[in-house]
Each structure stands twice: as C-alpha cells, then as structure tokens.
Amino acid sequence: MSTLLDIKSSVLRQVQVCPSFRRKTEQEPEVTNSQEPPTGAWKPGDGVEFFAHMRLILKKGDGRQGLPCPEVLLRSGSPAPAEPVDPNRGLRTLTQEEVEMLYEEALYTVLHRAGTMGPDQVDDEEVLLSYLQQVFGTSSEEHMEAIMRVKKAKAPTYALKVSVMRAKNLLAKDPNGFSDPYCMLGILPASSAPQEPSGQKEQRFGFRKGSKRSSPLPAKCIQVTEVKNSTLNPVWKEHFLFEIDDVNTDQLHLDIWDHDDDVSLAEACRKLNEVIGLKGMTRYFKQIVKSARANGTAGPTEDHTDDFLGCLNIPIREVPVAGADRWFKLEPRSSASRVQGDCHLVLKLITTQRDTVMSQRGRSGFLSYLLLLSRVLRFEHRVEEPNSSSWRGELSGPGTTVLCLHGAQSNLSPLQLAVLHWQVSSRHHQTRTLDYGYLLGLLEDVQAHWEEAASLPQEQEESLADSFSAFSEFGLRLLRQLRDYFPATNSTAVYRLELLLKCLEKLQLFQPAFEICPFETELSMDIAAALKRGNREWYDQLLNTKSPREQPGPQRLAGLVELADIIYEDLQLCYGVYASLFHGILKVDFFTLTFRQLERLVAEEAWVLTEELSPKMNLEVASGLFELYLTLADTQRFWSCIPGRESRSLALAGIHTPFLPAVKLWLQVLRDQAKWRLQGAVDVDTLEPVDAASKHSSSAATASLCLSHIQELWVRLAWPDPSQAQGLGTQLSQDMCEASLFYTELLRKKVDTQPGAAGEAVSEQLCVVLNNVELVRRASGQALRGLAWSEGASGLEGVLPRPLLSCIQALDEDLHREAHTVTAHLTSKMVADIRKYIQHISLSPDSIQNDEAVAPLLKYLDEKLALLNDALVKENLNRVLEALWELLLQAILQALSANRDVSADFYGRFHFTLEALVSFFHAEGQGLPLENLRDGSYKRLQEELRLHKCSTRECIEQFYLDKLKQRSLEQNRFGRLTVRCHYEAAEQRLAVEVLHAADLLPLDANGLSDPFVIVELGPPHLFPLVRSQRTQVKARTLHPVYDELFHFSVPAEACRRRGACVLFTVMDHDWLSTNDFAGEAALGLGGISGIARPHVGGGMRPGQPITLHLRRPRAQVRSALRMLEGRTSREAQEFVKKLKELEKCMEADL
C-alpha cells in the first residue's frame, strides 16, 4: 500500500523556518553609478539623480538623532595643532655681565656644596661643572678662568636650620604614667666629640654630667624648647638656627628630658641664647649647673633633677642637600641607659654669607634661582625635546642637582621653590610649548605649599601675580581660537584643553588669596567674553568664505546651506565635547553661550535670504531652501531635546513659515520624480530575484527604498505647525499610495508584455511579481505609518490621524486585491492538472485502495509546492495555498455533481481524499491552520459527502433539521409569526394555534398582501397520515390576526424523533394566478409542552406564545434538496416535486 497518505508536505514544514522576505534597502541593485550626484539642482524628470541627492540629505541627518556622545565625536588621536608661541613673552634677556654673574653664582654653588647627595643626584664635581659649561655655552678657557675666580673667593658661612616638630612613644618618668618632656639642642664641635677609652663602658655625650665631670660644656649656643606637660607624644614645632664652623666635623646634639623641679637646668638654659661666644656661654652654663645642684635634694653622686629620656647625635655632613624631614630613633647616653621613642626633626643646611658678585650687589637668592632655573629649563628643553609640545620639564641629574644645591644654599622655602618653578615654566611655555599636565602639577604644588605657608614677601607675591596674569592672558587668547588649537575631533587636543582649563581653574582659586589681585575682573567672565569673541570671529570668517553677502541670492544659498551644516556640526561638538569640560571645570555654560550666539547669527542670514529668494522661487531655489530648512530645523530641535530647555525663545522659532512655499514645491516634485524613478526601475527589471537570498526583483527593492526615503524625509522635516503638517502629510500619504499602485500597474503591464516560458506550469515571473507586490505592500504600510503627524492638543498620542489611517487601509486593500489577482493568475495555470487528477480519483475503480487513488494528486501537489516554496515568500505561499485549497474543493464538488447514482465507495473515496488533503495542507501545523481549512467550501463539501452516504429519509430529515437551524440565523426581513403549540397527551394529539403575524412582505400591487398560513408536520415519513391544514385568508393586510386552532392526531414518540417539526408557510392568496410565497418558519416538536422530557427542561406552558421569524430557504437547506433530486426513489421524487412547486412560487415573487 502506498505511503503517500502520510505525506505532510516537507515543503510546508519548512515555511515557518524560512524568513518572509529580506529587504535590501542599503542600496538600489540596479544603480551602479559610483559617482556622487552633483551638488547643484537635479534635472526635472531624472528620478535617479533626484533620489541620489535625497539620499545625501538623509545621510547628512543620520548623525543628528538625539544627543551626541563624546566617544563618538572624538575620532582622531593624532598630535594636537601647534599653539602660537612668542619669544618676547618669556623672561627678559640678560646682559652679558648678568650672565657672567649668574655663571659665577652657579659655579660657587657647586664648588661649595655641602651635605649628603640623594640617590638621584650627581656628586661628581667635574660632571656638575661640565654641565654648567654646557648650559651657559662658555669655552674651556672661559670656564677655567671662572672656576679659578670662584675658588679664590671666600667660602660661604653655613648654618643649620633645625625644626623640632614632635616626639612619640617616650618613656614614662612620672608616677601618673606620663612625662613632662622638653628638648635641649646645640652644635658639638669636632674637638668636643666624646672619646671612648678601650675597655670602658660606652658613654654618649649629654648636656648634663655627673659630679665626676669637671670639663666645660662643649655645645655652642644651646637652645631649649618648651616643656610639654603630661604627655608621651609631645608636639613642639619650634625652629632654631645654628651657625656651623665645619660642616665636615660638627654634629647636632639633642637631649630630651623630663622636667620635674620647680627650678631646673632647663629654666636656666633658656638664658643661654643671650650669651655670645663659646667661652662665655661655657662659664655661664657651669654656674647654672652648680646652682641647680645646690638647690636640689639629691646627693652629689645621685642623678639630676630632670630625668633623661633620650638623645640624638647627627653629623652635619650627613644632612641631605635637599634637607631632612623624618623621624630619628632616640639613643641612650650609655649602654646602661633605658630610653624609647622617636623624635621628628626637619633639618636644612644653608649658607648665610656668600662671596659672589650677585650677593654683594644685594641680589636675592630668589632672583638668582629664578634666572638659573630659566637658563637650565631652556637648555634641557632644547636638548631633550626640541620639537615636542608634550615635554613635562623632566630635568637631567646634573640639572636637578645644581638647582637643589642652589635652592638649599639660598634658604628658599618649599613655597618659594614651587612659585619659582611655576613662574619660569609658565613663561617658558609661552615661548616653547610645554605639557599642560606639567604646568597643572606646578600649580598644585604652589597651592599645597600656599596652604601651609600662606605668605610670601610682597615683591615675590607681586611677581607671582604677574605670572598668573600673563598665563591667563595667554590662555584666553587660545580659547578665542578654540576650534583651531583644540579641535573637538582630536582627542589629544581635547585632553590638552582639559588640562589648560584646569590650570585656569587653579588661577581662579588663587584670586581671593592675593592682597594684590592679578585679575581686574572675575576670570570666568573673561573666559566667557573670550569665547563669545572667538565665536563671532569664527562665524564671520566662515560666512565670508562660504556665503559672502555681496553675491547674488541663488549663489549665496548653496554656501549658506554648507554654513548651516558646519554650524550644526560645531554645536554637536560643543555639546558633546566642550560643554562638559567648561561647565565641569570652570562652571562656564559654554554650550548655551555658543548656541544662542550662533543660532541668532544664522537665523538672521536665513530670514534675509528667504525674503530675497521668495519672488524667484524655482526648482533649484526650492531644493536649496528645502535642504537649508532641514538643517535649521535640526538645529532648533537639537536645543529643545536638551532637558530643561525650550526653543520658543530662540531666533529660529517660527523659521518654518517663510520656507513653506519651497517645501510644498519640493514635495510636488518628489511625487513626479518618484514615478519617474519607479518607471525606470521597472523598465530595466528582468523579473528575476536580486540574488540567491532574495525572492523579489530589483524594481521592488528600488520601490521599497524610495518609500523608505520619503518616510525618513518626512521624519526629518517634522513640520512644527500642526495644521500645516496635516495638509503636507495628507498630500504626501496620497502621493505614496499613488506611487505604490502605479508600481503594481507597471508590473502588471510588464507581465502582460512578457509572458512566461511556453509549457511552464508555474511561472517564475509571476512568483517574482507576487513577491514584489508583497514587499511593496509591507514597505508602503510601514512608510505610511511613519508619516504620522501631530494633530495638536486634540490629537491622541500613539494614534494615527484618521486621514492617514484611511489611506493606509485603502492602500492595503488595493494591494491585497492585486496580490490575489496575481495569485489567481498563478494558480489558474494549475487548474487543468488538478481537474485531471480529480477525474483520476473519480474514475478509479472501487477495487483499488483509496490512498493509491489519491497518490498521483498528492505527488503533483508536493512537486509544485516545492517549486513555489523556493520562489515565494511565506505570505505569498500562504495565499497560493489558500487559492489551491479552494480550487481543489471546487474541483471535487464539480466531480460530485457530475456523478449520479454511483456507489457508496465513490463517495467514501472522495471523503478519504478530502481528509488526506486536509492533512497535507496543514502539514503538522507548518501549513494552513485547520480552522481555515475546515471552513467555507470545506463544510459544504463535507456535507455533500455525508448526505450522499445517507438514505432518502435521512436526507429528508436533514432538510428539516437545516430549516430548524436556519431560524436563529435569519434577521427580521420577511416578518414575524406568533403561534402557540402544545401536546395533549390524553387525546394523543398536537394542538397548534396560529395567533397573528406582523411586518409581512407586501406582495400585491397595492402594497399589501392577502396572507394565509399553511400548517404541516414534517418529515412526511414520520407523519404519513397527517394532512396539512391552513388558516383563513386575511385580505389586504401586512399584520393579519388569525387566532385559529388546529389539531393533529400524532403519537408523542413521533414528535420526539430527529427532525420532527411544525412547518408554517405564509402565502399570499392570488385570485387570478398562483399563490405567492411570503415566508416560512419551523418549530421543533421536541421542546414543546407535553413532549419535552423532564430532564430537557419541562417544556413550555400551553398559554405561552412563540414568535417565529419568517425566512426563505438558504443554500445549506437546498443542498439536501439537490441530493434528493439525484435519487430515483418514489419517496424522494415526490418530496422534490412538492418543494419544486413551492420554489416556483418563490421565484415568481422575486
């Protein structure tokens, strides 16, 4: 047995997996022109060039949706543009004498260096001297002569600056668990250093000695700090200065004591600062010691009044050149002493007298350091980074060492050093560009040290203020030309701008710190003024370049379009890049400032130009104005899309008004150009798929692209006036509908002139055309929905305007109709084959199996659907399936009508065929839905097959059942009949009372009728002995009242049979001819009072009337009649004869 019955159409199963179609709107396949269209006006009627120009307009607007992101705008990491430099803005040029004096100062610093070098410093004297020779550019002879002069000069006088800051974790000496510490400190000459005889206990020097010590105290100018009561972590922050005789041998000695007596050595030592000279100080100190001992209670051999807490011995030569700022661990006087804790000291070795010309002439160390740093910085920049603007001032080892030595010897504070490096570097930056990060770091150093020291000599503060003013003036000049020196698309330049703004921010922070303010006004106001001036200069230059005012209006228009585009792009950059920098750093609203200024300027130009060009309106002018308006509208919307900002107060508000005539003219041309474009696309279309992945041809892609471009253009247009937008949108939607229908008409004409290949059952060209129609239907629907315009305050958000919705629905219906027409044309080529296979099933002998009879049809359908699946998109495949399904049902119905008096196997075979086709077309859910398959003609065919299998009486019963079903479906068109019916069980009779009728059809010429009612029971074989009865005729009325009662002697069981009913037929009595049929109604007997069983509901009370709607027999009622017509039995023929007579009456009425 064949297995074709199990075929579920593998083709149909794949339908759900395949995409409907793939729109290729990136480019039009048939357009291969690689050249961009000219920027001038397009030629009238040249659709390709027009839409190419429109694509450029749309492409220009692609980047204008929403607010820009900085990461999108920053596109280049190339070096930043070079900033302007001016050699005259640096420090003044020194005279030759001043250079020689500075050279001598630097050599003197190196030759008389003292202290310990750091790990990054150079301790080689020859290297340092050679470095200075290179910095000053002297010859070897001049260099040696200068060295000899410096060596003959007196050595400098050294001094040690000591800051006793704090101590921690000291030993507790008092009963309360604390101590009352104070410090005694002084300089120990080399001759006073303690000697340690071999074999004796280790003994360190101390400012106190036991009773056995008789030598004078060796310390010079002993200083003492205040006593800090009850603490183990004292804080002093006291500063002292000690002269140094020999930096190589002298030591700093410091003792920490616990103060216990009212009169102690500490109090006496405070007066030692008044003693001048070591000899006098020693004698005085000895007297103080004796006095303290005499007043104490301890014995001569006991410890002294103040308890020892620790000491420090620091050789002067070990003090770093840059100074020391650290914690020192306290040491005991001897190995037997018990001490703990640390002491924080700040040490710096300086010179107090220098035998140099600059010192002799009163030039301060501040000035000499400034000049030396400037010299070194210029030399290092020239050597290290001759052509770079990213140099961060990294000095070489010798350069750092020389400056460190000079700064320390000149006793410059950290604040002074920070100020000097800023002054020199900021001035040098204006002559040769440095890295702004380096300058920002210098400002941060100044700020940090300023907060600590908070003061400078007035002269130095004024010098710092001058450097701030010079740098701010330089920065403002750069900000005026912001777009030139810091282009927003260059990430390197933007980063330099960010650092420059941070430098200016630091300058702002210094304003309240100066007694003499370096700025006449607030720096932020100066910055805003510089930005405004820069905006105006940039705009004027751009206007003179792109659209000079002396040119005629039409020539200026193209330039103004370009200018407006540049301004929009500039505003994007301002918002996406510059705005956050200026607002976040300086609190300057750069974007608002720039937008309002540029928007006002470009609006003024646009108003003037539109007034000039309005009388000269033509296609070229309209094109230019249309493009100009789009950019201006984008500019206005760009402002309004920023939260909290409205565009009503802008100069561009209302700018759409003068552009309306140009926009209308341009949209009119768009309609004509669209048709030309579609015509050209269809002319060159070969009605073949674009590629293997697509099922539509090139013209459909072009049509879809055109519709999409029109919709995108409308979105770009976004006309602000609701009433005007409705008119423009309505016209544009009608133009799009017209273009879509125009395209389908062109396709139909092309198919008519290019028929498919001879003998081809399924035309590939028709499949492509069908796919084209579907693609355009979807594209047009999507494009039209995108045309939704605002209806003002009365419009609902998200609801399409009514005119647009009507247009969309009408076009969709038209394109659906066109698709069904093409589908019918496509399936008509299969009609002959389908009829042949249906006839094969009809003529198959009863001896073969049903599936064998159906096999050829299923195989044919499977092959054709495989071809259709490859050629059609899913939507069109479904259309073809539906058409084929209807075609098959009609073919089977025709086969059934053509065969009479056939065997039951014949109808069984077609019943099998119908179910096999349902399974085939459903394809396990991948094909047509079952509810669609089992509807319409399927029901009619299934009923035909069922009736053909029924007996004559079953067909008659079905006839009456159909009448009963018809009652509830018919509307009140033919009037109403009210009756009352019940069964009298005692007499075994049925009582039927005809009460009255209403709203009957007027069947006579006078507009009335002469109605009477025929009452009969059916089906006849259930009531063979019962004759029909009739009421009296009621003349000239449409609302007769009968009130007549009829009895029918019938058993109750007969009334309960299937199809048992009372049939009321209303006739119009005609005296001269055949009576006319007015309507009929049927009432089932199974539910009337006396017949209905208790579980059915108890029936109806005898007195309850029933109103029946009159109707005429419908098609499903006549199907049973047609079935009976083919029967040859007497019962069937008599029944049909009776009904035929009734139908004649009905036809006469029509």
Swiss-Prot record:
Binding site for Ca(2+) 3: 1003-1004, 1068, 1070, 1076
Record: residues binding Ca(2+) 4: 1070, 1073, 1076
Cofactor note (record): Binds 3 Ca(2+) ions per C2 domain.
Domain of life: Eukaryota
Keywords tagged on the record: Calcium, Cell membrane, Cytoplasm, Endosome, Exocytosis, Golgi apparatus, Membrane, Metal-binding, Repeat, Transport
GO annotations of cellular component type: cytosol; GABA-ergic synapse; late endosome membrane; plasma membrane; presynapse; recycling endosome membrane; trans-Golgi network membrane
Domain MHD1: 626-747
Ranges for region Disordered: 22-44, 193-214
Cofactor: Ca(2+)
Domain C2, first and last residues per copy: 139-298, 973-1099
Topology of the protein relative to the lipid bilayer: Peripheral membrane protein
Residues engaged in binding Ca(2+) 2: 1004, 1010, 1068, 1070
Gene3D superfamilies registered for this protein in UniProt: 1.10.357.50, C2 domain
Biological processes per GO annotation: dense core granule maturation; exocytosis; G protein-coupled receptor signaling pathway; modulation of chemical synaptic transmission; positive regulation of insulin secretion involved in cellular response to glucose stimulus; positive regulation of neurotransmitter secretion; regulation of behavior; regulation of dense core granule exocytosis
Sequence ranges assigned to domain MHD2 in this UniProt record: 851-959
Organs and tissues of expression: Prominently expressed in brain structures including hypothalamus, amygdala, stria terminalis and periaqueductal gray (at protein level). Expressed in nonneuronal tissues, including placenta, lung, pancreas, spleen, and testes. Within placenta, expression is restricted to the syncytiotrophoblasts.
Matches recorded under SUPFAM superfamilies: C2 domain (Calcium/lipid-binding domain, CaLB)
Keyword field contains Cell membrane: yes
Subcellular location: Cytoplasm, Cytosol; Recycling endosome membrane; Late endosome membrane; Golgi apparatus, trans-Golgi network membrane
Disruption phenotype: Mutant mice are viable, fertile and have overall normal development. Behavioral phenotyping show increased susceptibility to pentylenetetrazole-induced seizures, increased anxiety in females, and benzodiazepine tolerance in males.
GO molecular function annotations of the record: calcium ion binding; phospholipid binding; SNARE binding; syntaxin binding
Entries under PROSITE patterns matching the protein: C2 (PS50004), MHD1 (PS51258), MHD2 (PS51259)
Assigned protein family: Belongs to the unc-13 family.
Function: Functions in endosome to Golgi retrograde transport. In response to calcium influx, may interact with SNARE fusion receptors and membrane phospholipids to mediate endosome fusion with the trans-Golgi network. By promoting the recycling of secretory vesicle transmembrane proteins, it indirectly controls dense-core secretory vesicle biogenesis, maturation and their ability to mediate the constitutive and regulated secretion of neurotransmitters and hormones.
Assembly notes: Interacts with ADGRB1, this interaction is direct. Interacts with endosomal SNARE proteins VAMP3, VAMP4, STX6 and STX16; this interaction is increased in the presence of calcium.
Protein name, per record: BAI1-associated protein 3
Organism: Mus musculus (Mouse)
